[in-house]
Design a protein with these regions (language model features):
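Serine-esterase "nucleophile elbow" of acetyl-processing enzymes
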Residues: 1-41, 46, 51-60
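Alpha-helical cap/lid subdomain in secreted, periplasmic
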Residues: 22-31, 49-185
């Protein structure tokens, strides 16, 4: 069994020594599940479509985690393009690999204007997941619930650049994703 993570800066673990893909690898290795991370800093959904044959297909994942949104939002990828790219990735994964596809959102951003900008992308992820029967992991809502229950400030679990989670934030990502991944394994 193989899980492949394909995303941008967050999935690549920018700014931390162990990102959520590393934590998932540690969690699932004893079960014989391989976790491969083919994410790169700053990449958008356009990059994932363009490199599907090189980054995803050769690994033949059983589960594909497609984690884009924040880099797209701040790289001027239009919402319509983002949606089209996600649809293309899902269809390629199903046609060429028969892989289950997991679409996570990202964390809440503390700045209300930036949060509103990425919320459009999170809604798009929800639409694609519903339309194409993918597994969606609403990290942003789980994150909000976690912070509400435990009382940390909105910028808790984030690096100096609030678009990136810190090590503890990556732990939250891994926890939220594992709930869905456990059901697929």
């Amino acid at each position: 069994m193989r899980i492949l993570v394909r995303g941008g800066s967050i999935a690549a673990g920018v700014g931390v020594s162990r990102g959520y893909a590393d934590l998932l690898r540690e969690r699932y290795a004893p079960l014989g599940v391989e976790v491969v991370n083919r994410s790169r800093p700053g990449e958008t959904s356009f990059d994932a479509v363009e490199t599907f044959a090189a980054d995803i297909e050769p690994h033949r994942p059983d589960i594909l985690v497609v984690h884009f949104g924040i880099d797209d939002a701040f790289s001027s990828v239009y919402r319509s393009e983002f949606k089209e790219n996600l649809v293309r990735i899902v269809r390629l994964a199903r046609r060429r690999l028969s892989a289950a596809v997991v679409l996570p959102t990202s964390h809440l951003l503390p700045d209300p204007h930036e949060r509103a900008a990425v919320d459009v992308y999170y809604r798009t992820i929800r639409e694609v997941a519903a339309d194409l029967a993918c597994e969606m992991v609403p990290v942003h809502t789980a994150w909000a619930g976690y912070c509400t229950d435990r009382g940390p400030a909105g910028s808790a679990f984030l690096q100096a650049d609030p678009r990136l989670p810190d090590e503890e934030g990556h732990g939250l990502y891994a926890t939220f994703l594992a709930v869905r991944l456990d059901r697929l394994l």
